[in-house]
Amino acid sequence: MIDKVSVQECAICGACINACPVDAISLDKVHLDFRYPQINEDICIHCNRCEKACPILGNKGKPDEGYPVAFAAKSENDPMRMRSSSGGVFYELADQMLRDGGYVCGAVFDDKFHVKHILSNAKEDILRMMDSKYAQSDVGYCYREVKDVLEKGCKVLFSGCPCQVAGLRTFLGKEYPNLVLVELICHGIPSDHMLQTYIGMQERKYGARLTRMEFRNKKKGWHNSSVRMEFANGKVHSEPMTFDTYMQGYFRGVTLKESCFSCQFRAFKSGSDLTIGDLWGAEISIPDMDDNNGLSAVIVNSEKGTLFLNRSEIVRRQFEIDKILKYNQSLLTSFDEGAQRAAFYAYTERCDLERAIETFFQETLLQKAKRKFRFFLRYAWYTLQGKGKPLY
């Protein structure tokens, strides 16, 4: 049974839940603020399909020979690029799959701002899949749905965190030529409960229900992305993402899932065909492509990935992978689990989660001093490059 995997190892990818033929596994085991798979012993038939599907217990993927190959990339569709978190690459890949008559599986917000994966061939759902969502996504039974349409001969593009890509691979148990796997560059994942708690705090602060949320609004530019929350009474919360209370917990690594600190799927071990994310450092390493509207890093890990990328309408330029790794170290290494995380969760046992968020994630004087120093350096750089003043 899947109980061979501890909560310290489990990525909550959902492969075991999808693999169980009698639906004996559900996300009912609570550890800290995450929900983990739990087996109903009264239903379990001990077939061990959950173990066979588990990416923690299974073989890890690796790039094809001659890969990975890296690119700086962006969409030429400027409205879609501005709507995206970085360079609009996911939109272009998903749009290509729709033009091929296929399906796309990716993460969306539902009407209560829970993050979940859906499988769809509708353009409006692709738009919902765009934008970063910094919370654990519930894949539900999407892996089963993906397998069903693959077996019918349909094409599918699956997008998710490396652990979710690995989970789908091991659930399927074989390669499908009609499946394109796209992993996101991943720092780690906070829980749905953490996000819902933060949303509740903000709704009380602004006195109305949340109607729209963007973690990476680019109204002030890609390099000045902000968390934007719109409420039913017309009020708006907009704050630089590096200052936002929720994102403070994320960036410090305090609110991440336990397995993220020893992730087994970094260094291209998920088995993805493509890896996508922000091309941080672009203003230094490739300034002629950086217009502050968003630029993506695309890393190709397979021949299938190359063929699909070549058919998409993505503007790209081959780029040194070492320069991507310099500013995206989470591609190779996990975040260190520091003492503050233990202190935070110990505090939640004495008080509630809201009080812990307020206490731990407000900007300190030292952090403010560091921020102002970084702003000074950025101001000097932008001035020398003639790019104008950064906003923060």
Task: Tell me the role of every PLM-derived stretch.
Residues 169-180, 199-204:
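Short, surface-exposed basic-aromatic patches at helix termini and helix-loop junctions that form
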Residues 180-201:
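Short, flexible loop segments at boundaries between secondary-structure elements
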Residues 85-88, 111, 158-168, 188-190:
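Gly/Ser/Thr-rich loops at beta-strand to alpha-helix junctions
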Residues 42-152, 326-341, 346, 350-356:
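Flanking helices and flexible, charged tails adjoining ferredoxin-like Fe-S electron-transfer domains
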Residues 100-103, 203, 208-392:
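Long, compositionally biased charged/polar accessory segments in the mid-to-C-terminal portions
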Residues 8-23, 45-57, 161-167, 256-268:
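Local cysteine-cluster metal-coordination motifs and their immediate loop/turn environment
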Residues 1-7, 38-42, 242-251:
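Short, intrinsically disordered, charge-biased short linear motifs at domain edges
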Residues 2-3, 9, 15-38, 48-66, ...:
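Iron-sulfur cluster-binding cysteine motifs and their immediate structural context
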